[in-house]
Amino acid sequence: MGQKINPFGYRLGITENHRSKWFSDSNKVGERYRDFVLEDDAIRKAMSKDLERAGVSRIVIERTRDRVRVDIHTARPGIVIGRRGAEAERVRAKLEKLTGKQVQLNIFEVKNAALDAQLVAQGIAEQLTNRVTFRRAMRKAQQDAMRAGAKGIRIKLSGRLGGAEMSRSEFYREGCVPLQTLRALIDYGFFEAKTTYGRIGVKVWIYKGDMTEREFEEQQAQQSNNRQGRRGDRRPRRGQRNAAPQQNAAAEAPAAAEAPAATETKE
């Protein structure tokens, strides 16, 4: 099964960003790397369970020394906020109890749910739970995504489709979905439909177009600058110690020759 790879991890640093933004090298209990990973997983599971009707697309977690920032991207922000912010306050209090730190809760609205793969997968799963035929649910999701401006969509259902005795997988695809092109903006989502005859897995890939050459080059340049910035405090290698002063002197000589003479103007 070596050909299977996580769609997010495959594109990290190219078209995808990390959804947990923090660093830990501590050995103190509660602040170790594994502790933060388990805590992030618990936060996401709690939010998915409590906000199941809110259409949560993704949850981004950032950490500082004494604060946890949780960004919730949802298609129905009104459900997350609640009446006069009561629901948001309840969620924040629950997260503070879970983490033991001050929690900053930010809620963002997903403008176009038809182009969000996670929300499309949740929509198909809800229809399957409500006994809508799987072919009809897949066809409707495809049509909505293509009308919203997607260049391609791919949907896979796995399980006892239609209540069949033997489980199977069904693929539907419309348009172009280049999964091997790293410059392609591919959005991926997964959700499980809980039906009376078992669970059905729903996977959705939505192709939104390629990154332009300029965007790709800018992103690569920014990443290389970040890597060089992290290495700036290192000592030069042995072969580079003597070459560095010579290079600096050679670079300063042409600059001095090309610089125009200063002129003084009097009024």
UniProtKB/Swiss-Prot annotation:
* One Pfam family hit: KH_2
Q: Which residues form the KH type-2 domain?
A: 43-111
Q: Which UniProt keywords apply?
A: Ribonucleoprotein, Ribosomal protein, RNA-binding, rRNA-binding
In the record, which residues are listed under signal peptide? none
Region spans: Disordered:
216-267
User: Mind telling me which SMART domains this protein's record contains?
Assistant: KH
Composition bias of kind Low complexity appears in: 241-267
HAMAP family, alphabetized: Ribosomal_uS3_B
* Complex formation: Part of the 30S ribosomal subunit. Forms a tight complex with proteins S10 and S14.
Q: Which family does it belong to?
A: Belongs to the universal ribosomal protein uS3 family.
Record's protein name = Small ribosomal subunit protein uS3
Q: Which organism is it from?
A: Bifidobacterium adolescentis (strain ATCC 15703 / DSM 20083 / NCTC 11814 / E194a)
